[in-house]
From Swiss-Prot:
One of its GO terms (biological process) is nuclear-transcribed mRNA catabolic process. Residues 216-239 are annotated as: Disordered. CDD domains: Ribosomal_P0_like. Coiled coil: none annotated. Residues 221-239 have a biased composition (Acidic residues). Component of the ribosome assembly machinery. Nuclear paralog of the ribosomal protein P0, it binds pre-60S subunits at an early stage of assembly in the nucleolus, and is replaced by P0 in cytoplasmic pre-60S subunits and mature 80S ribosomes. PANTHER family: MRNA TURNOVER PROTEIN 4 HOMOLOG, MRNA TURNOVER PROTEIN 4 MRTO4. Transmembrane segments: none annotated. Pfam families: Ribosomal_L10 (PF00466), RL10P_insert (PF17777). Keywords: Cytoplasm, Nucleus, Phosphoprotein, Ribosome biogenesis. This is mRNA turnover protein 4 homolog. The gene is MRTO4. Belongs to the universal ribosomal protein uL10 family.
Length: 239
């Protein structure tokens, strides 16, 4: 009798070992960066998008960025004065809560601040985001959509029909009001009609100077109770 695929045993020891190796490698990489670069900046991310963070990594190939795995980063840097890797790094660890990351660089404080202050990218809002403006659709043909899309639009709540093979909005339709917490359906409609409401923004919050060990605040303070970010995006790129 052939064995059922359900009976296949998976070695948890191998999985655990691999996970431990990845964490150890990340710790070593972080400490290597502490030894290599002049400055360490903590940044926060609003409306996280992996693709847009990758664009920043490409623009900052001369530096190193780490995002996600906050607990592992805290182990690498040290949580207290007694176990910190270098002077005052425990102050960095205290701020690793929520959607934050680390930037190691030789660029000056002024250069970093100027670049990230100017950088912003718009994207489509997701369910749970707040609408930043009201969107109303006027009745009439929606020629940007193929006829095969009509049932999907109707399912999303739009009053549509096919008229002579053209998708047509039969009456005025309010997609959302400013301040609404968007539903999945609203977010989908906004994307289909090309309305971008989410601003992807990276804000520099703190700086640590490797030479002096000085830790200083640069932007608004981060909330102490923010949830920890544990599985988001790529930890680092090669420099």
């Amino acid at each position: 009798m052939p064995k059922s695929k359900r009976d296949k045993k998976v070695s948890l020891t191998k999985t655990a070992k691999k996970g431990l190796e990845l964490k150890q490698n990340l710790i070593e990489e972080l400490r290597k960066c502490v030894d290599t670069y002049k400055y360490l900046f903590i940044f926060s991310v609003a409306n996280m998008r992996n693709s847009k963070l990758k664009d920043i990594r490409n623009a900052w190939k001369h530096s190193r960025m780490f995002f996600g795995k906050n607990k592992v980063m805290m182990v690498a840097l040290g949580r207290s004065p007694s176990d910190e890797y270098k002077d005052n790094l425990h102050q960095v660890s205290k701020k690793l809560r929520g959607e934050v990351g680390l930037l190691f660089t030789n660029r000056t404080k002024e250069e970093v601040d100027e670049w990230f202050t100017k950088y912003t990218e718009m994207d489509y809002a997701r369910a749970g985001n707040k609408a930043t403006f009201t969107v109303n659709l006027d009745p009439g043909p929606l020629e940007q959509f193929p006829h095969s899309m009509e049932p999907q639009l109707r399912q999303l709540g739009l009053p549509t029909a096919l008229k002579k093979g053209v998708v047509t909005l039969l009456s005025d339709y309010e997609v959302c009001k400013e301040g609404d917490v968007l539903t999945p359906e609203q977010a989908r409609v906004l994307k289909l009609f090309g309305y971008e409401m989410a601003e992807f923004k990276v804000s520099i919050k703190y700086m640590w100077d490797a030479q002096s060990g000085r830790f200083q605040q640069m932007g608004d303070d981060l909330p102490e109770s923010a949830p920890e970010s544990e599985g988001e995006s790529e930890e680092e790129d090669d420099s």
